[in-house]
A protein has these predicted regions:
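Short amphipathic alpha-helical segments and helix-helix/interface helices
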Residues: 5-6, 59, 120, 182
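Conserved beta-strand termini and adjacent loop/short-helix elements that scaffold enzyme active sites
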Residues: 17-19, 72-74, 133
Length: 192
């Protein structure tokens, strides 16, 4: 999970985290926004799942800064679930004939919804807790409803800022995450 990082930085020095922010550089100026907390607050947690003093201090800093945050008990599961969702979203942009209009392609949104549900199902079968709770909701939603939600998200200002811009400007990163995620699912399924 985080062994390599601990070998590099030292045991007990890592707090796995994920920022609740998105954006991109436009003409050398960073245009970034905090994601709505209902979508994704800045999330962090201890590797062992506990609540340490340093974790509570970090939470206090975010609270005083008015930055939405959430302490997550199992960051490894959280990050896997995040990948289960964002990898197919990025893939949809790359498959679209006109990436900025991906949300208008009903069949592509249906395929994306099916892939997200399949990814979450694979994680669930591997014993990964679906977290945060919205991942359990996505896992249970009918494909038709999820694909409609994706169409709205892809065509929204939110989708442009937090999904499209990152997917298009971080192509190498997203391809690497694609390969790592599906490699992880495949290798874990082979072991079981």
């Amino acid at each position: 999970k985080y062994n390599t990082w601990e070998e590099i930085c030292g045991k007990g020095r890592i707090i796995p985290a994920f920022p609740g922010v998105g954006g991109s550089f436009e003409e050398n100026i960073l245009d970034a926004k905090l994601t709505p907390s209902i979508i994704q607050a800045t999330t962090f947690g201890e590797i062992n799942g506990g609540k340490s003093e340093r974790l509570l201090q970090l939470a206090s800093i975010f609270k005083r800064s008015y930055i939405p945050y959430k302490i997550e008990k199992d960051m490894h599961a959280w990050q896997l679930c995040h990948l289960a969702m964002i990898v197919p979203i990025a893939d949809a942009y790359y498959e679209a004939g006109v990436p900025e209009k991906a949300g208008e392609d009903r069949e592509l949104m249906r395929k994306t919804a099916i892939t997200i549900k399949k990814n979450l199902d694979s994680l669930h079968k591997l014993g990964v807790t679906l977290t945060p709770k919205k991942m359990k909701v996505l896992h249970r939603l009918p494909v038709q409803i999820l694909s409609i939600g994706l169409r709205f998200a892809f065509q929204s200002e939110f989708g442009n800022t937090f999904m499209y811009q990152h997917s298009m400007k971080a192509l190498d990163e997203m391809r690497a995450l694609h390969n790592q995620f599906y490699g992880y699912i495949g290798s874990e399924e082979d072991r079981n």
